[in-house]
Amino acid sequence: MGNGERGRPNKKMKYGGKDDQKMKNIQNAEDYYDDADEDSRDGEGEEKKRDFTKLELKPDHGNRPLWACADGRIFLETFSPLYKQAYDFLIAIAEPVCRPESMHEYNLTPHSLYAAVSVGLETETIISVLNKLSKTKLPKEMIEFIHASTANYGKVKLVLKKNRYFIESPFPEVLKRLLSDDVINRARFSSEPYYGGDGFSVGRTCGELEAGPGELLNEAEFAAAAEEKETHSFEIDPAQVENVKQRCLPNALNYPMLEEYDFRNDNVNPDLDMELKPHAQPRPYQEKSLSKMFGNGRARSGIIVLPCGAGKSLVGVSAAARIKKSCLCLATNAVSVDQWAFQFKLWSTIRDDQICRFTSDSKERFRGNAGVVVTTYNMVAFGGKRSEESEKIIEEMRNREWGLLLMDEVHVVPAHMFRKVISITKSHCKLGLTATLVREDERITDLNFLIGPKLYEANWLDLVKGGFIANVQCAEVWCPMTKEFFAEYLKKENSKKKQALYVMNPNKFRACEFLIRFHEQQRGDKIIVFADNLFALTEYAMKLRKPMIYGATSHIERTKILEAFKTSKDVNTVFLSKVGDNSIDIPEANVIIQISSHAGSRRQEAQRLGRILRAKGKLEDRMAGGKEEYNAFFYSLVSTDTQEMYYSTKRQQFLIDQGYSFKVITSLPPPDAGSSLSYHSQEEQLSLLGKVMNAGDDLVGLEQLEEDTDGMALQKARRSMGSMSVMSGSKGMVYMEYNSGRHKSGQQFKKPKDPTKRHNLFKKRYV
């Protein structure tokens, strides 16, 4: 779904349902080798190249913009006059793999086709338009794959009625097939009020007209049909909704659930008096993303992917204003909560008493029957003991039927802790917003059943050319290690301090200081310096006398520093730890200097770039090739000949796939900088080295925030060696006694287990 799972296309197309005979008819990639070409694969049968000589070009192929290959890959020429229409179509049916300036690569997957049908595209429409745009005749295998992936979509719906979940279908035989699965059968409640002959509750619902081929490219909404259809349904346990949706995906039972909210005909939940203000004018790509979400008078659950700074907030507020029901908005931190509350008031007519914030510092409630609650994932997912006031608010959240669940930075939802919010809160429609649909722990595909399919994804370079986001110059600055630092870096006993050594490299410090001076004094820019390593963050900020924000910084102090950075001419540089990666809106910043990072995280690299992507200046100056070719700068400082070089290359992959290129700079600071910069003399460098080596291992590590397996996926398990000296406080640690709570005062310790009752595998340990 995101770059985390799509990365590069599979060599063979993968299919979903096991019992669909169409799946078995699709040929293997064997047909696309030249039998005479012995070099087409290596000794293990791995494919090296393919023979596409069997593809027949159409006579007017020069006027058609794309190539369709039998393995599911599609290549689009961006210089074609039909590029815009072809892009809008491809982004609806396929996953983007790589989108450089001249040629895009896409990949058809079961999930991408599931998303296509969910926004109203019929199977025959997809095949017909692909054939019209393709330079060659569509391969038979691709046609069969499209049929197989879309055959069952729309046959099953997940419906929320009066805080109860029902699986609904006009086909009772489909429900029987679902109930033959153990997971779904266990999740069923058997308390339906009215049963048909098959044991399902029977009701009636309005049908709807399907889209024709002529309605595809002009985005026409589908008209609702008047006839009624008989539907069959059964109720499922709300706690099992996630598991049931997962079992219905294309890679399992292949009956993807349709989640639509007929909000205009919802007379049960109270309406929210909320409209967009006249000055809220969504841009063309924002309108397009909303048109994918709303169709046929209904709201679809799913994900919208827009670059940082491209106006995701306006999309979210517009969706809430269109549904006009109670909305629960989830953000990643308290600063982001304040910003979202501000965005709702900025773009909509919502009154102050209709919107409230729920954080550790602010526990508000809206007045009336409907309103907007803005809170964090942590506040909702927290499983520990709460204050009485917080418990009441959470209970209200659980008992309310939310019209819209709006999730910012939705890529964090697959984390074990955050995905709880999906089961805790009940909502008719879920909208996820993100700039980076990518994770390193391969959980990004979980969003298909946690939230829904990807509805729309914008192309970064198109928005740059349109002047909607900043035109960024990306550069990788190579900083040679000093010989003293490199000697310590190579020692085996310093394995835990390797990162601190290459981050505190004096040449890197000097390059950072030079860039700050250049952009502050000669260009008057606003600069953000990112460092994941807290030891380095503190040393850099203290030495250069700049404000810093990290995990332990209070909310009040964060707000004060950010406000000074935005408004004061005296505060032009701020140091941020990883807390600044997500959901902090700093539109004034136009320079980023990254001195340390979280291993090879592609998502973090893109999120940090996004801090400076908001458009700057007048529109005519923002257009690519306007007054300034580049109006924002992203520097990644890397110590050469260290592990950081490998991580840097891996981190850049997502941005390269979006069409960005990295310039390599090897001569910073310039030779004439001399003693004007810090750590010029060897004595200063040795003093810094001593400070790094004398710091405890716990002080030179990465900042630890809320647990997310995406970050853990980049780390290896480590074994630490201790000594009795740490107990005396020689490394900043002290010995403390405490009661864990398991044995209260006056209670006796539990007797050890009888050795004869131990399992055979463990008996020998107690001999």
Swiss-Prot record:
Record domain Helicase ATP-binding: where: 293-455
Ranges spanned by the short sequence motif Nuclear localization signal, renumbered to the chain: 750-766
Locations listed in the record: Nucleus
Residues covered by region (Disordered): 1-51, 742-767
UniProt feature, compositional bias: Basic and acidic residues: 42-51
Amino acid composition bias (Acidic residues), ranges on this chain: 31-41
Keywords: ATP-binding, DNA damage, DNA repair, DNA-binding, Helicase, Hydrolase, Isomerase, Nucleotide-binding, Nucleus, Transcription, Transcription regulation
Start-end of Basic residues biased regions: 758-767
E.C. number(s) listed in UniProt: 5.6.2.4
Principal subcellular localisation of the protein: nucleus
Stated induction or repression of this protein's expression: Higher transcription in light than in dark.
Tissue: Expressed ubiquitously.
PANTHER family membership: GENERAL TRANSCRIPTION AND DNA REPAIR FACTOR IIH HELICASE SUBUNIT XPB, RAD25/XP-B DNA REPAIR HELICASE
Subunit structure: Component of the 7-subunit TFIIH core complex composed of XPB, XPD, TFB1/GTF2H1, GTF2H2/P44, TFB4/GTF2H3, TFB2/GTF2H4 and TFB5/GTF2H5, which is active in NER. The core complex associates with the 3-subunit CDK-activating kinase (CAK) module composed of CYCH1/cyclin H1, CDKD and MAT1/At4g30820 to form the 10-subunit holoenzyme (holo-TFIIH) active in transcription.
Family affiliation: Belongs to the helicase family. RAD25/XPB subfamily.
Name the UniProt record assigns to this protein: General transcription and DNA repair factor IIH helicase/translocase subunit XPB1
